[in-house]
Amino acid sequence: MKTVDAIYSRKSTRHYRNVRIERAVLQEILSAGIQAPSPKNDQPWKFLIVEEEEKKEAIANILEKQLEKVGERNAMTGIIRKDIESAFESVRILKEASTLIFVYLDTNIYDMHNDNLVWELNAADVECTHIMAIGAAIQNILLAATDKGIDSLW
């Protein structure tokens, strides 16, 4: 599949068949993520793969409890947020997918030279570029999954 074809055929899927992704295919998809551009090529991402049902259920339970707390707090103030309501649907999707790929910021890169040098930049300025790099890695992962015929959701 051409890259442009993957871009235009990629879609967000909210219902999954419980089909395992072969290890070699998953590795190819993650390798595409690693190829994303990053500031100074510091590759600030870490990937966590979750396939075990018990772990997915535990993660979903934690998320549901946090969402309930936010919902209770909002109810007390009279605020109704549709994004919180729709987040419960995301938790359902999380339980249904066979493979979860969590992408997170590796904060160890902030002292990668072990010299305790503190930049004058605000941490938010540095983190912003790293978060953009993580977004690029996620996009590569989604496009690689599309290329392999695997449905995904951001």
Give the predicted meaning of each segment:
Residues 37, 145:
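Hydrophobic pocket-lining residues that define ligand/cofactor binding sites across diverse proteins
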Residues 40-51:
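Short loop-to-beta-strand entry elements in the cores of soluble alpha/beta enzymes
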Residues 39-42, 93-95:
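Solvent-exposed alpha-helices and their adjacent loops that cap or buttress functional pockets
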Residues 128-129, 148-154:
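GST superfamily/GST-like fold recognition
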Residues 1-27, 43:
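Specificity-determining recognition surfaces
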Residues 49-133:
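Glycine/small-residue-rich phosphate/adenosyl-binding loop
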